[in-house]
Amino acid sequence: YTCNKGLQGIIYSGNIVIDSILSNGLANLENRGINLKCSIIIPPSLNIADVDLCILFGNLIDNAVEACERIVEPGRKKFIVLNVNIKKDYLFIDIANSFTGEVKKQNNIYRTVKIDERYCGIGLFNIRKIVEKYNGEFSVSHSDNVFSVSVMLSLLWGKK
């Protein structure tokens, strides 16, 4: 299934859990000046727990949207590019977004750039835990104005 924004901004990929998370998390992007491009080619069901899909996609989307919203320079493009697909027995998720260019790293781990850090910065930690659970891989990178996260999860998890 391919990601298409239908009536009222609802995303249809064919997977109801992912559709719900993305439709909610990516609602009203146009009104916030954020351009969205996405391609989601997945089956209706995956061998990944729904709660893990919610945590994974929820954190990825929230981080991308919040990073775009921190851009305040007039005329600066705000965007999110999301690609989700399956190759062999793996789910691949790649998300890239514009951001201010400000990065905080401590012991080679990305930290939040939010002012109130008490309840922030656990999103990437939660993503890493899910990646470990599904014998996957996880990478984070950035250039001057683009922040990218790539996730690969095994769909053979729990199968004997």
Segments and roles (model prediction):
Residues G101, S143-S150, L156:
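Glycine-rich nucleotide-binding loop
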Residues D89-G121:
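Glycine-rich/acidic phosphate-handling loop/turn and adjacent ATP-lid/helix
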Residues P74-D89:
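Short beta-strand/loop element within the Bergerat-fold HATPase_c
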Residues I10, L36-F57:
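Conserved short strand/loop->alpha-helix "switch" segment adjacent to the catalytic nucleotide/phosphoryl-transfer site
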Residues T2, G14-N31:
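Short beta-to-alpha transition helix within the HATPase_c
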Residues V65-R76:
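A short, flexible helix-to-loop-to-beta junction within the catalytic ATP-binding CA
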